[in-house]
Structure formats: structure tokens, C-alpha cells
Amino acid sequence: MGMSSERLERIDNMLKQSLVDNTIPGAVALIARNGKIVFHEAYGNADANGKKLKRDAIFRIASQSKAITSTAVMMLWEEGKFRLDDPISQYIPEFKNPKVLVNFKYADTTYTTRPANKEITIRHLLTHTSGIGYGAIDKDERMKMIYDKAGTIDLFTTAPVTIKDVVLKIAQLPLHHNPGEQYTYSLGLDVLGYFVEVISGMTFQDYLLKHLFIPLGMNDTNFYFSASKSDRLVAIQHKVNDRWENYPNTFYDVNYPIEGAKTFFSGGAGLSSTAKDYATFLQMFLNGGELNGKRFLSRTTIASMMGNQTGDLYGGGDQYYGLAFGVLTEQGQAKGGLGSQGTFIWGGYFNTQYFADPKENLIGIILKQTQGSTGDQTSWKFKQMVEASIDD
């Protein structure tokens, strides 16, 4: 497969050493080259009680959901259902006449706005340039407070709420900035999950199952799981006095994928998956939109998705943002250890990372479930060492 077995062993040793160093409680790592899995191992524990992690463990992939949502949007785009530069208000009228935040009073959370200078488009939502906020995890304290007061549920919930409920609330809230002028990580992909429902006439979950997960054979990827799979869900852990403990409920319920109402199909952060399933999704992209004889996207569409959509608004020259992923530039490749130019990259809130290198037909995925500071170095080491294991 063009990978050095000795160098793959170094990766194995690095991950084992990370357990010894106590910087991770456990991980599943997968490497694929030329469409074949060459490395797929589980390390450490799935919870703080010593349950062993297995290769088919299910992880909350959080923001790794975004690329899947973008893919669904582009599949509908290929059907001629809309244009990328259509205003979202054409399909969700509540987004008409967006407003930008001007002044905010911390004392009583009142604020003033001004009209935005343009409408939010579907492209803005795909590229995190809409100006929409990110609620509980927004970097701007004012936005956190505005979203909290409005009662938006941003992510990871067991409550009986739908994405429509939340998206219609988001539509009434102020933007960080005029659409298209800055990159601000946002709930835009949650808006697009509801957009998929509007365009397709199906629930977002049903659309993904019918058009992506079932045809791709991604049988362990979903928003919610039944009791038969619940024991495969990895616990979120954090360090307390240098010991790993199961993470408590905070602004979200840690068991959201297996408990509660199971009605919130969050396109931005709601999915859980396995390393093998996510590798399957990425391989479809490396194959130019096809897998196992089934066509999901045209290679011409993928070329647009991998193109620079954000200019210099994102990535500081090493990366730009396309329509679904961060994409490595020539400058990023020159830095070393990140992959070839065109490598696409993202990760998730609970310490999951992936990259796919089209030039080398190479995929690397490393999944953990942690919160807080742990001293974890596996993300950069894994990427650097995987690329260095190419041997052809």
C-alpha cells in the first residue's frame, strides 16, 4: 500500500506512550492509503471505569458533522434546487433583513443593531462568513448572552426540540458582522440542516440516512442510537488531579446520543460515528465523489468545494476554507507535517481530528473523547508521522 510497516509501528508506539504519559485516556486511530485501511487500532479505555476501547467504538464527532451537512447541501445543489448565492431568506423567510449587533449593555443584555448591508446567502452559511453566532461556545461574550437569553439550544441536547425551532430563533438574532466580510465559526451548518429539510421535504436525519449513510455503508453514523449500540458510545473524560474521570453534565447532557427526545438533528455538531465510517466518507471525496460504484457528487462539484471560498479571511496563509473543509495551501505544505497542498482537514469539540490528502490518496483519523487541558500531543504527532510513513 506504499506505507512503511516500520514507520506505522512508530505511530503505534507513540500512541501507546501517550497512554503511559497519561495525556489521553484512549483513542482509536485509522490510516487508509489508496482506498485500503493499512492501520486501525484501539488504545486505552472507553470510560473511567476501565472498559477497554474497541475499534468499532462510537465517538461524538461534533464539528466533523459539518462536512457531512455540506455534502448533503451540495448533493441537492447538483439537482438544480438552488444557487449558492441565493439568499437563505428565499427558502427560510425569517432570515429576511438581517441586522448586525452595534451596542450591548451587560447590565440588562439589551442591545442595538443596524441593518446588514446584504442578505445571508447559502454560500455564506457553508463558509462561516454569514455573521451568525455560535451560542454557548461563541468567542464573543455578548453573543453568548444574547443567544442564552433567546433560549437557543446550540448543540448536544436531550431536550424535545427540533432544528426548525432553533433555526427560527437564530433568524431573529443579530449578526457579528455584515455577511461575507469576516470568517466567524457559527451555527450556519445547523441552519443548513434545516434548509435540507425545507428543500427535500424529509427530516435531516432521514435525508442523510437515505442519500449518504446507507448507500455508503456508514451503518454506525447517526444523530441518535438505539439501546443495541449504546454500550459502544465512548464516555467523555477529563483529568481531575491527574486521574481520568467521566465528564459530568454541564451546559449539555453527555449522553445526548443515546438518551432523551432524540429530535435535534444538528448539522453543525450532532452526529456520532466510528473511525471506519468516517474514513468511508472521506474516501468518497478522495475518489472524486464515488464509492463502491455509487456516485454521490461529481468531481467538478468537489473541485468547487475544495476551492478557496474565503480569500484570506481564514487560515493565515497555511489554509483556506472551502465549502466543507479547511484546505492546505502550498505555504501550508511547505511548513511540513501537515500534508500535501490540497489536503482537507477538520476536527471536533471532543478532541477528534482527521485529514485526507488527495495527492497521496491518504486518510488519517484519530478519535478521542476528552474535555479540558490534558497535555495531549497526539493530534499533531499523528498527522506528522502518518505523512512520514509514506514509502513509495
Where are these regions (language model features)?
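Short, conserved catalytic-motif segment at the N-terminal edge
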Residues: 2-61, 81, 100-105, 256, ...
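Short, conserved phosphate/pyrophosphate- and ester-handling motifs at nucleotide-, phospho-/glycolipid
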Residues: 4, 66, 274
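Active-site SXXK
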Residues: 12-15, 35, 59-88, 96-97, ...
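Extracellular/periplasmic catalytic domains that process cell-envelope and extracellular macromolecules
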Residues: 23, 51-53, 83, 113-119, ...
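Structural recognition of the beta-strand scaffold that forms the well-ordered cores
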Residues: 28-30, 40, 124-127, 184, ...
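A generic structural motif
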Residues: 44-45, 251, 370
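Short, surface-exposed loop or secondary-structure junction motifs
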Residues: 99-338
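Short, surface-exposed beta-strand/loop micro-motifs that present aromatic residues
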Residues: 343, 350-363
